[in-house]
């Protein structure tokens, strides 16, 4: 009758059992069973079948709270010795953790690629919100690209280079004359940009 009335659940161990557990210590397998989530702290009270507990028993002086941090186990350790290619898994693991170190001892260099920003448009973030501002391309960049194109034409021959340079200059003069007409039509008197001094095709040397 007394055995049938035993309370269900955990029973309080004796002093001898507590001393035995203190002497043996908590093994790694017990910690793995106790804490399935790695990297989480648990206060462990020995003597209660290695179950997590934050209570302290004042009746036993040998019983103390212990805190153990379980090491992070890499998901590649189980696949490392069975001949499975773990390159894709490693990349997913690195991208998920945003780290350049894997616990297996593999170091990788994560180099950031060049940012592809449009030259004509940049985004400016302010405290009031998102504001976009357009800027004109840098003249030096355009001139460098034009110079490289002309140098390639010179490698092909002098005649194609002279023809392209003359076409470029005629198009540029046409654009300047059109710009002067637009400025006269839209700007008020006194703010007209002095574009009358633009050299004409007659004053330019023939190539």
From Swiss-Prot:
Highest rank taxon of the organism: Viruses
Keywords: Virion
Record keyword Cell inner membrane present: no
Major subcellular location class: virion
Keyword hit for Transcription: no
Gene Ontology cellular-component terms listed: virion component
Family listed: Belongs to the coronavirus I protein family.
Further remark: The gene encoding this protein is included within the N gene (alternative ORF).
Protein name as annotated: Protein I
Originating species: Murine coronavirus (strain 3)
Native organism taxonomy: Viruses, Riboviria, Orthornavirae, Pisuviricota, Pisoniviricetes
């Amino acid at each position: 009758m007394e055995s049938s009335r035993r309370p269900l659940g955990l029973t309080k161990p004796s002093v001898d059992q507590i001393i035995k557990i203190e002497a043996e210590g908590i093994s790694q397998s017990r910690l793995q069973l106790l804490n399935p989530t790695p990297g989480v702290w648990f206060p462990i009270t020995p003597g209660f079948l290695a179950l997590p507990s934050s209570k302290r028993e004042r009746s036993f002086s040998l019983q103390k709270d212990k805190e153990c941090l379980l090491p992070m186990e890499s998901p590649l350790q189980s696949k490392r010795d069975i001949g499975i290619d773990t390159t894709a898994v490693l990349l997913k693991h690195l991208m998920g953790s945003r780290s350049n170190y894997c616990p297996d001892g593999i170091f990788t260099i994560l180099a950031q690629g060049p940012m592809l920003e449009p030259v004509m448009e940049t985004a400016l973030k302010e405290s009031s919100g998102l504001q976009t501002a357009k800027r004109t391309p840098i003249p030096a960049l355009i001139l460098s690209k034009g110079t490289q194109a002309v140098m390639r034409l010179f490698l092909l021959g002098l005649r194609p280079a002279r023809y392209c340079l003359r076409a470029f200059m005629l198009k540029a003069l046409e654009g300047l004359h059109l710009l002067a007409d637009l400025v006269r039509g839209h700007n008020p008197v006194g703010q007209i940009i002095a574009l009358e001094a633009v050299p004409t095709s007659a004053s330019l040397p023939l190539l």
